[in-house]
Design a protein with these regions (language model features):
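Structured catalytic core of nucleotide-sugar glycosyltransferases
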Residues: 1-104
Length: 104
C-alpha cells in the first residue's frame, strides 16, 4: 500500500503530553494529519516537529468538525484511505499496520 494514499487523522485539543509520540508511532503507516482544534498549548508545533501535517482551527469547533477538516484535507491530498485515532494515546497504534495489511 502506497503510504501517501493513507491518511491518519488525529484530532487534538491540548495534547502536548502525548501528540509527538503518537505522530512518530504512526508516521511509517501513512500521511499523518493532526487537526489542532483550538489548542492553547504547543500541541500543533510538537505535532509538526514530529512530522505531521497540521490543520489548525483558531477556536475549538468540536470533535466532529475536527474530523471533518481532517477528511477534507486528506481528500485534497488524494488519499484513498483514512484512519482516525485520538490524540490522547488511548488507541493501540500498532493496529494500524495490521488493519492496512488486512485490506491490502
Amino acid at each position: 500500500m502506497d503510504r501517501h494514499r493513507v491518511a491518519i487523522i488525529i484530532p487534538t485539543l491540548n495534547e502536548s503530553n502525548t501528540i509527538a509520540n503518537i505522530v512518530q508511532s504512526v508516521l511509517p503507516s501513512g500521511r499523518v494529519i493532526v487537526v489542532d482544534d483550538g489548542s492553547t498549548d504547543n500541541s500543533a508545533q510538537l505535532a509538526s516537529n514530529a512530522g505531521a501535517e497540521v490543520v489548525r482551527h483558531k477556536t475549538n469547533l468540536g470533535y466532529d468538525k475536527a474530523i471533518d477538516s481532517g477528511f477534507a484535507y486528506a481528500s485534497d491530498l488524494g488519499c484513498k484511505i483514512a484512519i482516525t485515532i485520538d490524540g490522547d494515546g488511548q488507541h493501540d497504534t500498532s493496529l494500524i499496520e495490521k488493519f492496512l495489511s488486512e485490506i491490502n
